[in-house]
Design a protein with these regions (language model features):
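Bacterial Sec-dependent N-terminal signal peptides
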Residues: 1-26
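Low-complexity, acidic Ser/Thr/Pro/Gly-rich terminal tails and inter-domain linkers that flank the onset
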Residues: 24-48, 88-100
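Short, well-ordered beta-strand segments enriched in hydrophobic/aromatic residues
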Residues: 48-61
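Hydrophobic residues positioned within well-ordered beta-strands of beta-sheet architectures
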Residues: 52, 116-118, 146
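The feature marks short-to-medium sequence segments in extracytoplasmic or secretory-pathway proteins
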Residues: 58-108
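Short, solvent-exposed, Trp/other aromatic-anchored flexible loops in extracytoplasmic proteins
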Residues: 86-131, 138-139
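Terminal connector regions
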Residues: 135-150
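Pro/Ala/Gly-rich low-complexity, hydrophilic intrinsically disordered segments
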Residues: 147-181
């Protein structure tokens, strides 16, 4: 009986500590970014990674498709935390194509004012620090976000990934190089 009691106590504390070790923050803001139509909805610091929940809405102009008919994120995208030169690399994306030298992939938009929600997953960053998301520091058209902040007291519950992207299917187009051609 005492072994069962000890196991139950250990499990209880493990679960309690596990829940406290992760944090989710809604209402993240950034000082400078690529477009006011790009939103950072939530930052989740999970056990092994940091997930950034985002949304983009195409412009409501008649010529929306001249500037906003597609989007993607480069495979070298990373997070840099304030006061550090360490790069926390993007691990994967959910509902957003990753573009690389070997394979060009794009999310294609169908109409003006179209909203698309997606998630970028990075190596785990330290909690409570402001950070930047850098796609390409040398490209003025890249998705670079500077001064991303969130309030640690604005803790929120985890977002269900399937529900988050359910209404926003990705329409992907791609091409790749074979033998240099």
């Amino acid at each position: 009986m005492s072994k069962l009691y000890i196991i139950c106590i250990i499990l209880f504390y493990s679960l309690f500590i596990g829940v406290k070790a992760h944090a989710q923050y809604a209402g993240a803001k950034y000082e400078k970014g690529p477009s006011p139509k790009m939103e950072i909805l939530q930052v989740d610091n999970r056990e092994l990674s940091t997930m950034v929940y985002m949304a983009y809405t195409t412009p409501d102009a008649d010529n929306w498709n001249e500037t906003s008919s597609w989007m993607n994120f480069g495979d070298k995208t990373f997070i840099q935390v304030e006061g550090s030169s360490k790069q926390y690399h993007m691990i994967s994306t959910i509902n957003m194509p990753i573009n690389s030298e070997a394979e060009n992939k794009y999310m294609m938009f169908d109409r003006r004012n179209q909203r698309h929600q997606f998630i970028l997953e990075f190596e785990k960053i330290p909690e409570g620090k402001s950070f930047d998301i850098i796609e390409d520091v040398n490209n003025p058209n890249a998705f670079n976000f500077y001064g991303i902040t969130y309030t640690p007291t604005d803790s929120n519950s985890y977002v269900d990934v399937d529900e988050f992207i359910a209404g926003y299917p990705v329409k992907e187009m791609g091409r790749y190089v074979v033998k240099g051609n």
